[in-house]
């Protein structure tokens, strides 16, 4: 019985041969990567040369990039090269994905775009410097304060004003989906006291009398509006202006947004405006927002 069993084992063509990861065909690895998130792909690229080569496949990364990635390359990456960002030209889809996942400034540094590393969804930030703001050039009303808390290196601080109107717009080719627009605001002036960051509330006033109106509209006729009193001092809050839906691929959309408090019966002041955020609707929960 033992001899018979031994002869059967020896007759098996693959007996005694163990298959390792190096034996997995590269096209199988590529197919597997199509179902994985980018961080997992980058981790598995270290396994061996076959995994590394498969992790660089354009077929894998074309599937991970947003449908509007060609627009992003033209609008953002090529714009950076024109203003002197010294990076080599990008050809592979993996390199495009990696570059777009960084914070990318464009439009003379007044706007920023980046991809979520896992989902490939697009996020935008718009600086107050890209907006029209009442009295912004008058130092009696406004000042720009350097801050490492800002995406743009500085925040816009309102000392005091009667009529507040901050309006901005952006023309952008969004991937189809639903998006939220939020204003990043803080009541109180950031200062340093005894070497520590703190917030002065000395000039905060007028925001509890009448509500602030946040609005957005799009070139295809969508509108949204919300009103609220600003009552959270000493910390950054994302105030939700509204949502809009993009249905058509490869079709640029104008998005106009504003923040208004134009009741001239009282002054208001002590407010910091950092930026406006446009994010996929399902990601707005990552921001501490007021609705």
Curated annotation (Swiss-Prot):
MF annotations from Gene Ontology: carbohydrate binding
- Source taxon at top rank: Eukaryota
Q: What is its main location?
A: nucleus
Subcellular location(s) per record: Nucleus
Kindly indicate whether the keyword Nucleus belongs to this entry: yes
InterPro entries per record:
F-box-like_dom_sf, F-box_dom, PP2-like
The protein's matches in CDD domains, at most eight in alphabetical order, are given as:
F-box_AtSKIP3-like (cd22162)
Is ATP-binding found in the keyword set? no
Its UniProt pathway annotation is:
Protein modification; protein ubiquitination
Keywords, A to Z, come to: Nucleus, Ubl conjugation pathway
Q: Where is the signal peptide?
A: none
Q: Which GO cellular component terms, listed alphabetically, does the Swiss-Prot or TrEMBL entry include?
A: nucleus
**Where's the F-box domain?**
18-64
Task: State the Gene Ontology BP annotations.
Answer: protein ubiquitination
Q: Which Pfam families match?
A: PP2
The record's note on its domains: The F-box is necessary for the interaction with ASK proteins.
General function of this protein? Component of SCF(ASK-cullin-F-box) E3 ubiquitin ligase complexes, which may mediate the ubiquitination and subsequent proteasomal degradation of target proteins.
Its subunit composition reads: Part of a SCF (SKP1-cullin-F-box) protein ligase complex. Interacts with SKP1A/ASK1 and SPK1B/ASK2.
The name this protein goes by in its record: F-box protein PP2-A14
Gene name per UniProt? PP2A14
């Amino acid at each position: 019985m033992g001899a018979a069993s031994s002869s059967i084992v020896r007759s098996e063509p693959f007996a005694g041969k163990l298959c390792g990861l190096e034996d997995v065909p590269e096209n199988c690895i590529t197919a597997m990567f199509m179902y994985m998130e980018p961080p997992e792909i980058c981790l598995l690229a270290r396994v061996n040369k076959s995994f590394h080569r498969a992790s660089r496949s354009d077929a894998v990364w074309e599937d991970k990039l947003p449908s509007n990635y060609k627009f992003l390359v033209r609008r953002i990456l090529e714009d950076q090269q024109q203003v002197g960002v010294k990076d080599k030209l990008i050809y592979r889809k993996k390199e495009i994905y990696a570059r777009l996942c960084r914070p990318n400034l464009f439009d003379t540094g007044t706007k920023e775009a980046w991809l979520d590393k896992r989902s490939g969804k697009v996020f935008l930030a718009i600086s107050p410097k890209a907006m029209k703001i009442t009295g912004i050039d008058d130092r009696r009303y406004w000042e720009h304060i350097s801050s490492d808390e800002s995406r743009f290196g500085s925040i816009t601080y309102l000392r005091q004003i009667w009529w507040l109107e901050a309006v901005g717009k952006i023309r952008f080719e969004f991937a189809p989906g639903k998006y939220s627009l939020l204003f990043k605001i803080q009541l109180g002036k950031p200062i340093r006291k005894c070497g520590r960051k703190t917030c002065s509330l000395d000039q905060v006033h007028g925001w509890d009398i009448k509500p602030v109106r946040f609005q957005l509209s799009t070139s295809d006729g969508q509108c949204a509006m919300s009103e609220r009193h600003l009552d959270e001092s000493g910390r950054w809050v994302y105030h939700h202006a509204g949502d809009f839906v993009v249905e058509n691929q490869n079709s640029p959309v104008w998005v106009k947004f504003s923040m208004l408090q134009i009741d001239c019966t009282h002054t208001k002041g002590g407010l910091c405006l950092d930026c406006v955020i446009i994010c996929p609707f399902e990601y707005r929960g990552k921001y501490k927002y007021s609705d």
